[in-house]
Amino acid sequence: METTVRKQKKNLETKKPSIYSLQLHEMQDWLKEQGEPKFRAGQIFDWLYKKRVKNYEDMSNLSKGLREKLSNSFDITTLNTLVKQTSSDGTIKFLFQLYDGYSIETVLMRHEYGNSICVTTQVGCRIGCTFCASTLGGLKRNLEAGEIVAQVVEVQRALDESEERVSSLVVMGIGEPFDNYDNLMGFLRIINHEKGLHIGARHMTVSTSGIIPKIYKFAEEDLQINFAISLHAPNSELRSKLMPINRAYKLPDLMEAIKYYVNRTGRRITFEYGLFGGENDQVEHAEELAALLKGVKCHVNLIPVNYVPERDYVRTPREQIFLFEKTLKDRGVNVTIRREQGHDIDAACGQLRAKERKEETR
């Protein structure tokens, strides 16, 4: 009987590229190399993203020869579901296993306006935010575009049973999306394409901790995707304490990049601001934040933090959250408090994965 380690080693040795990593034009190029007509690419995408088949044999309008070529060239398997937690509010958290044994998290959130999914872009994270469970254990590797796509496909398959669909997505799961930029953009283009899952660009949001060169690059992309910055502090000193990335990419330089993005795209930016009891949640912090954002076309999303056992931060009291919000509103800042979801499951980013890793080491 094969051990888990031996199976993982075999998977690494025999791994083929994921078919879910291919954009339509890349599929067309591959078909041309195989002497096949390029219209077959649309048929293949239809099987993958509309019918969501799990094997090539089901692609009945393709020749046997083409199905064999696909099978020999590309892996069609997606992800193995290790854990599926369902909250009382309908939020579902998936722990998926990758081909090499690593695990990642994906979250389905239900809203009045539809179903939203939060996807992961890396196994672990190197950014080192002091409040985040995702950084525990460091960065293991980047996800391929197909592994990010597969998260959406798997969640959509789960929704197919109730004839629902994923209507929006946020790239705010484990990892720093801009630290895996090329695979991120490949994923977004596949998911957005009318032959893919066809999720509208304006229904997708990418969040970054502030990798400044990639913000300038993102401003030049042709997709009208919503953009969010994990800010969490109104000044450099406090931000460096909470987010070590601020030592490399200073807050004043970050704000310049953000202003360039807003002016270049004409789109509003969202600032994510987690509230940590006694750290960044006082009235003076709100006043300083309002001054920092003055003149910037933006929205502030206040996030009551989830408790992470491995971290020391505590939740801001409810009345203090409302006072912080009021202080911003009184100074003309567009602000909302994020609705909490999945409070009765391991909802904080990286929490379920960290719990699973801890159990594996016992």
From Swiss-Prot:
Residues that bind [4Fe-4S] cluster: C125, C129, C132
Cofactor list: [4Fe-4S] cluster
PROSITE patterns reported for this sequence: RADICAL_SAM
Keyword vocabulary terms for this entry: 4Fe-4S, Cytoplasm, Disulfide bond, Iron, Iron-sulfur, Metal-binding, Methyltransferase, rRNA processing, S-adenosyl-L-methionine, Transferase, tRNA processing
GO annotations of cellular component type: cytoplasm
Keyword flag tRNA processing: yes
Parts of the chain that traverse the membrane: none
InterPro entries named in the record: Aldolase_TIM, Methyltransferase_A, RlmN_N, RNA_MTrfase_RlmN, rRNA_lsu_MTrfase_RlmN/Cfr, rSAM
UniProt domain Radical SAM core: residue ranges: 111-344
The keyword Methyltransferase appears for this protein: yes
GO biological process, one term: tRNA methylation
Location(s) in or outside the cell: Cytoplasm
Remaining remarks: Reaction proceeds by a ping-pong mechanism involving intermediate methylation of a conserved cysteine residue.
Task of the protein: Specifically methylates position 2 of adenine 2503 in 23S rRNA and position 2 of adenine 37 in tRNAs.
Family the entry assigns: Belongs to the radical SAM superfamily. RlmN family.
HAMAP family from the UniProt entry: RNA_methyltr_RlmN
Protein name: Probable dual-specificity RNA methyltransferase RlmN
Organism field: Bacillus anthracis
